[in-house]
Amino acid sequence: MKLIIAAPSPYARKVRVSLQEKKIDHEVIVDVPWNKNTLTKDKNPLGKVPILITKDKQHIFDSKVIIRYLDQIVPNPKLYPNDYKNELSMLTIEAIADGICDAVVLIRLENVRVNNLISKQWIERQEEKIFNGLKYLSKDLGSKNYFVDDYFNIADISAFTSLEYVDIRFKELDWRKEFPNLDNYWKFHNTRDSFANTKPSSQKIDPITY
């Protein structure tokens, strides 16, 4: 298998963590989907990462679909549960975590536009989403080490990934001070091999002039 990613992408990281948890052999290909010479557009009509290329050359996207696929071909460890109640809870945490990442991405893209096109109001709107999303995660987590059903699953992959993405893209938000239980949660999971082996890194993208 081959996995096309952007180095800082939290969505790609979710897939990378899942692949490592399931011990599936794969090759990682790093791309910059925002740049003109990206190879991503040839693999996904939306021009987005991650993209999983299977041994039979099938292209699978986005992260949620890929991880569902991985759960089918390698059932253990199970990342999405079979029972409806727990699945709904996990999907809700995943949606909140992905929404936090979406807002961080939008701020990042706004900040790389030329100065006279940057909208402070747009950025403030995204910052509000991030804070409210973290507040929701904090309340839902409470004093637990896992979000749903006391075992590691897609909710934890999504939540942890979103916390570290906020760290690298939105450093001025001191979420650890604001939400100490999320900090404790981060410390509990930070040494997990699949997280330690998939730390995100920054990439340079072309300036946005429109």
Each model region followed by its residue ranges:
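Non-transmembrane alpha-helical segments in soluble domains
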Residues: 67, 71, 91-94, 134, ...
